[in-house]
UniProtKB/Swiss-Prot annotation:
Changing C27A: Abolishes the ability to induce epidermal terminal differentiation. GO terms for cellular component: nucleus. InterPro entries: ZNF750, ZNF750_Znf. Zn(2+) binds at C27, C30, H43, C49. This is Zinc finger protein 750. Induction: During epidermal differentiation: expression is activated by p63/TP63. Residues 370-397 have a biased composition (Basic and acidic residues). It comes from Homo sapiens. It holds the Pfam family zf-C2H2_7.
Amino acid sequence: MSLLKERKPKKPHYIPRPPGKPFKYKCFQCPFTCNEKSHLFNHMKYGLCKNSITLVSEQDRVPKCPKSNSLDPKQTNQPDATAKPASSKSVANGLSAFDSKLQHSSAREDIKENLELQARGTHRCLGQKPALHRASPCKSPAPEAALGAQPALEGAARPSAFVPVGEHRLKGPDNAEAPETLALHNPTAKAVSFHTKSAFHTPGYPWKAGSPFLPPEFPHKISSTKGLGAISPYMHPTIPEYPPHFYTEHGLATIYSPYLLAGSSPECDAPLLSVYGTQDPRHFLPHPGPIPKHLAPSPATYDHYRFFQQYPSNLPIPYGFYRPESAFSSYGLRLPPVTGLTRDQSSHLLEEATLVYPASSPSRLNPSDPNRKHVEFESPIPEAKDSSKAGQRDTEGSKMSPRAGSAATGSPGRPSPTDFMQTSQTCEGLYDLSNKAASSALGRLYPPEQSLTAFRPVKKSTECLPAQAAETTAESPVSLNVVNGDPPAPTGSASLVSEAAPSSPDDSSGMGPLNLSKKSEINLAATHEPTYQGSPQAETASFSELQDLPLNLSVKDPCNTQAPRPAFPGRPRAAEPAAAVPQKTGTEGSEDGPSHPETKPGSLDGDGAPPTGPGEEAPDACAVDSSEEQKQTAAVALCQLAAYSPRNIRVGDGDAAAPEPACRQDTPTLSSMESQEAQCDLRPKGQKRTSLRDAGKSQQGAKKAKLQDTARVFTLRRRARVS
């Protein structure tokens, strides 16, 4: 008992008496108090306290009740405590009256019989004794604490005193007005009996497994049902609540609606509503039919529903998803263009919405850009190249400009062909990879128109190169790019800055990537530049410049890559429809280096198809790249070109790069290579980092350079992707 007393503070099984008053053991079940713990034990445990019997058993059944009971018991305990300060009297009265009923005889018998129980009873009594003291000062906390603590201590064998104390207190308030323990006891006992029957029998709360278990141990505890009786209203709502929960969760909107409307109990309804934010999904699933029903039953709930319904309505957007290009620019960036419906709008929307292409956004700012971009989007529809360009923009948004980024990509690592292709392939893979083959054909057919549009505007820069560009265009995409190298030479004089600035003039007016390559000496640079320009910037620039000037798009233009000259000269080639197609192939191959490198190993067609897309892109990319993007890419390209600028090698590289396309069309490649050697120097060196290798290899041999250039284009592709 002393141990239990020590535990008292921890787990108050007792209500402590006021410190000024002697320890009176109080029955937790009832106001009965006695200085003799044995009396309390007998009273509480052995049916001496009918309340304790009923309450404890019921509370065992309804473990949740104690706290609720403790709330009311607090009130009861206070009156009880008030009576209990004279708890000696209360004990005398309670013991006399109640014991006269049950306690004296049963208490003594129980004391004798229940020395075993006295351990528990002792716990209770000890708890009660301090509880009496504690009762007046902190009855409300103590009851709850006692309720919570004693069950933990006694576990299965809860002291009826502990749990029932709260229960009794609940009852106590009913009888609390009677200061005498007897008055409280008798009415409480009666009420407890009644509640026990009502709560214990009526509640039908067998859901609490404790009830059958505890009653056997403490049949007297059944009186705890009194507390349950008070709680039972809640319990019943809880029980009804659960079925509605399940039904509603099952999506029985009708059930749920009635449930919400009728509501088993307002308590449950509010929690259920809050809980049933998930109801929205249920309703959402059946929403086609049930939605009206749901809306009728619970508008508040359907606010969530409406939100979810909107969400599903957004879900349809995946197929309507291309209409909101701006919304789904990353996904549908190319797709809306593919539809060709919102090419202009979609292009702008996608560009704007797709901040993924920061550089492309600046290019969009370019006046020409809208047309270019639209063309670009148009080309993506037919060609994967445009998509690859978009993909590269996505990937190269960091690099500089998505379109100008071809140069930027090239300058970072000559990835422009690679980046363009691989990045584009990544994004492009969604729908553009499929489009690529078709795009090759379509690109040549349809893109030539757009390319022509792009190319012809770009032609401003195209000087002598347009003829060469046309020649090379038909002959070799790289050749075309090489031819493009010459006109870019003046523009390329600005080198990368020239690429940015001329890109703005050339691209803005010509819609083509800037010819930043000042080194016309390296035609191979032009060849590599196509690879570099193959990146979005090169793509864009090269289409514009293909019209204006034959671009040296050779992948092998590390030195000339210095000024990643957009295939601006090559764009003029595109000016010619036939040339435009090959130019697209060549220039795009060079520009869209990723596509081109990818295609290079494959064939001119592979190159050509992607270039066609870029040709269309070119207006977009040129405008975009010509502005900020190309400037930025030019800066990057200049840095790279500075790093990789063996101009002689570049000339060789240009030759190698041209031969690479030349492998497809050797003669045009040679012609363009010659043109490019002058112009290729102007070609951005950064277009192809392979150009350094290619330069050496080109010096070794054009064919060797061609083969290795193709391999390097792929290598560059990988590098560009990495960069």
